[in-house]
Design a protein with these regions (language model features):
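A short helix-loop-beta submotif of the ANL/AMP-binding
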Residues: 110-117
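N-terminal small-domain helix-loop-helix segment of the aminotransferase-like
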Residues: 1-76, 83
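Alpha-helix termini
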Residues: 33, 61-63, 168-179, 232-237
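Active-site phosphate-binding strand-loop segment of PLP-dependent enzymes
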Residues: 123-196
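Conserved PLP-anchoring active-site segment centered on the Schiff-base-forming lysine
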Residues: 87-109
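Short acidic capping loops at alpha-helix termini that bridge into adjacent secondary structure
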Residues: 66-71, 91-94, 140, 178-179, ...
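Conserved core segment of the aminotransferase class I/II
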Residues: 206-262
Length: 262
């Protein structure tokens, strides 16, 4: 068989080119911007213009009052997840996620000293198994990691699912005397078909950190640009970006390339 009949499911590398507007913007930057600043270090919290633009886009799209202080640029969604988990957990904490899940969640969580626990799947819908979730949401859990649209199932978590999940998180947080953070991994948010819409998890639960990447939506996986968006009203909203900035420095994962943020 020819290569056109071979499908590689080992890596989510887009098979369509990036938008021509991106290429044109890069060419303009290289031709017109002063090279020293264009290729120099950006602030440890990221390029202010990029952060402001992302906040404005999220506010316009989802109706939540994001500001620059809520946005932390990262090297794709992978960097976003790793930083978000480190910011809201301590060694010995537990993190819940739902099967099936992106395999790298395991090392991301292990790197923080926390323990990943996996909620069993709910076939055939593969919406989160909320009965099992409620039972597994013990006092040790400080973070829940979700992925919608899901990799590998493609399932979009419904508004009903997110409403019920938020109610469970709110109830358990009150019971245990500490807020449980929701880290929402959303690199496929813009890639849906058949008229489907993707409910925004942060709209359902206040203590949410959204992790996004332009790798899939703009076909730019090699450029490594994403962000963490701390929901307005989230516990620690005024310090979480500072925390992730320090985590980035001390783990050697500084901000994405300056030119990509521009």
């Amino acid at each position: 068989i020819g290569s056109e009949n071979v499908f590689d499911y080992s890596l989510g590398n887009p098979s369509v080119p990036c938008p021509p507007e991106f290429t044109e913007a890069m060419q303009t930057l290289l031709a017109q911007e002063e090279p020293v600043s264009l290729h120099g270090y950006c602030p440890s919290q990221g390029d202010p213009g990029f952060r402001t633009a992302v906040a404005a886009h999220l506010t316009e799209t989802f109706g939540l009052p994001y500001a620059q202080k809520h946005i932390f640029p990262t090297t794709g969604a992978a960097g976003a997840i790793a930083h978000a988990i480190r910011a809201v957990t301590q060694p010995g904490d537990e993190v819940l996620t739902f099967a099936p899940y992106f395999p790298e969640y395991g090392p991301y969580v292990a790197g923080t000293g926390a323990v990943l626990r996996v909620v069993p799947p709910q076939a055939p819908t593969f919406q989160p198994n909320l009965d099992a979730f409620a039972q597994m949401l013990t006092e040790k859990v400080t973070c829940v990691l979700i992925n919608t649209p899901n990799n590998p199932t493609g399932v979009v978590y419904s508004a009903d699912t997110l409403t019920r999940m938020a109610a469970i998180l709110t109830e358990k947080s009150a019971q245990y005397g500490h807020n449980i953070f929701l880290v929402s991994d959303e690199p496929y948010r813009d890639i849906v078909f058949d008229g489907k819409t993707v409910p925004y998890p942060a709209a359902f639960y206040p203590h949410t950190l959204t992790c996004f990447s332009y790798s899939k939506s703009l076909s730019l996986p090699g450029e490594r640009l994403g962000y963490v968006a701390v929901r307005p009203g989230c516990e620690g909203e005024d310090i979480l970006v500072d925390m992730m900035s320090q985590i980035s420095r001390f783990t050697g994962h500084n901000c994405p390339p300056s030119i990509i943020q521009r």
